[in-house]
Amino acid sequence: MAQSLTQKAVNNFVRGLITEAAELTFPEGASVDELNCDLRRDGTRRRRLGIEYEESFQLSSFTLSDNELVSVGNWVNVGGNADLEFLVLQKGSTLYFYNKSDLPYSAQVEAFSVNLTSYEQSGSVGAENAKCQFASLKGNLVVSSSAINTIVVEYNISSVSVSQISFKIRDFEWQGNTTTYYSNDSTPSQNRKYDAQNTGWNTGNGAPTDLTKRLTHPWYSGKDADGNYSSSEFGKIYGGTTLTGNGHYILDFFTKNRQSASGITGLTKPTDIEASRFRCVESFSGRVFYAGLESAENAGTILFSKLADTISDLGVCHQVNDPTSEYLPDLLPTDGGEIKIPDAVKIQKLYAFQNSLFVFAENGVWQISGVDGVFTADAYSVNRVSRVGLLQPETFVEAEGVPFWWSRFGIHTLSTDPVSGQGSEQNLTIPTIQSFWDAIDSDAKLKVVSTYDSINKRIYWAYPDDGEAVESKLNNFLILDIPLQAFFPWRVENQTSSTDCVVGLAFYSGYGAKELELDVLTNSGADDVVTSAGDDVVSSQVSNFNTGDPAIVLICRDGATNKLTFGGFTSSGFLDWGDTNYSSYAETGYDFIGDLISKKTAPYIVTYCRLTEEGFTGNESIGYTAIRPSSLLVSTAWDFNENFQASQQAYRKKFPVVVDPNNLDVYDYPESVITTRLKVRGSGRSVRIRYESEQGKDFLLLGWGVIQGRNPRY
């Protein structure tokens, strides 16, 4: 009996890599394995472009050693100019600033830099060994890391000034045994004396000096009819076992010198030292939040500044009104303060979204929310939204207002309830690429960096090879296309020796601003204005620029000099670094043609590829070469065989192309799609197809059709 023939069309091979499906349950449109393919939302699949330096690139004046780390951040609204944005590049212990205003990007480094060793915390791992986190507020940049005292950078017309933030809090910690404070003590301990003064006793302005009274109510509750303190009146008040309010003293958060503040010696903790420093910083609700201390006492502590009007407000993390005051003890909505999450372990990242601040620790995620959509010091809530924490801060990325991060178990995101605003964690890798993710080396996961392309809606995570000796080198990319909800991997190949390499990622929107100096003239431009000393008078103004297409920018280290420059995936020569081949391929899932029992054949596959040639280079003497030629190699494997048959060329043009020497920009081919029919040998119950690139050539696969023959015999 003759075979029954059917046809199948595939035109949406863009679901990405799937490793969590079995042979019999593999989803349509997904790949079993793939590398270096660009999945496009129109349903096509293309070879990624090669990596190269930007046009007219410049090398940095500084070098990057094998052991130096690199971290990247953004400074927005620089100096209060909404159009001015800097890329902040941490190289070891130095911060460099690149204006995002103009091309080439690598030439836009500012003349100023910040030496972090000047603010290094004694006993830390060193400023060069701790990556910074950044927050922008009111045109200023706040910089934190576990190795430095938190600083703020101000932009002052082509220069910056740096100041260390001094964190002040009110002391709400009782020093003595509070169970004895419900009664008078004629011989109070030194700790009790401090606690009495911290509740308002012996602090001047009419406060009595007697430190023997019980601390169940404030001293001014004992005033007589004349407004004077009366010990007998104070004694008439029953306070029970309630402690009065404290917090009169304002102390430095990192060095709580109670002896100096109170003048009392002999305290159990005269000076309370916090040796660690804030790892995280985030601006939210007009304030700056700080977290990430490593001590047992303060691991879950989050400080937040008062509503910041000036730089001096950034360290005011306390109630402005004295809580022991008789008339103005109230906590104000605009005050600073302290939030404690006792069960948080190693807070890694703070992220502000809508009316909430999300706290990412190693052991979970917490949400700090305001009331009625506004965070205030006197009205907020804290709740835990996930027990899945953040592996390390640079895996975190925000895309379309939604956080994505790597944990010890996979890649996660948060969805928020549109009514309550409460977050809910979702694991993205369990149904998709968990096996692929698990295979990434544990040390490599600790060096992941990320960025988000907000134009093309893609998240890029980059990480090194196993055992990579260069601290900041990144060879591998895992990409998540948000609209497609598809993961796909890329890999940058090394040159044979002294290879260039990627060390960082950034996103450039294509817009920016820069400061211009204009010569001041008079008399309709005829006369130049100078000072009495003969110096030329100029006027500074900020102008906006369109820098071109938005793009992911790669920060690269030049292999010959170890200096830095910028590049991207832009080479239509389809070679990495201009001379190194890379393989682009994709393998389809297991196609049983709707039948698990019968054996089949696929005598013909018809592929559809878009014409990619864009013209010619060369001349009559040396010949002409097509610009951006394509090649697509196709092979098949039957049943569950991992060895594919010999490949065939699927990009076959039917018509000759005549070169017009007078117009090399034209590639005069009559069709925009190359259609090729391939004969396929073999048979089996299922078939897989592999598409692969050829060195130095493009491909753009639109889809394919398969003629399927089914054998009526089993």
State what each model feature region is.
Residues M1-V114, I157, Q164-W366, Y463-I482:
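N-terminal beta-propeller domains
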Residues L357-V385:
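Surface-exposed extracellular loop regions of Gram-negative outer-membrane beta-barrel proteins
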Residues M1-V109, S124-G139, V345, V388-L391, ...:
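Beta-sheet repeat architectures centered on beta-propellers
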Residues S122-S124, S146, N205, K223-D226, ...:
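Intrinsically disordered, low-complexity serine/threonine-rich repeat tracts
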Residues S158-Q164, V374-A379:
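A short alpha->loop->secondary-structure connector
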Residues Q348-A361, W366-I368, P393-S407, I411-L414:
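Conserved catalytic-core segments centered on acid/base and nucleophilic motifs
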Residues A147-S163, G300-F304, R408, T413-T416, ...:
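Short, surface-exposed terminal/edge motifs of secreted or surface/virion proteins that either
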Residues Q90, E120-N156, V288:
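Elongated alpha-helical scaffolds
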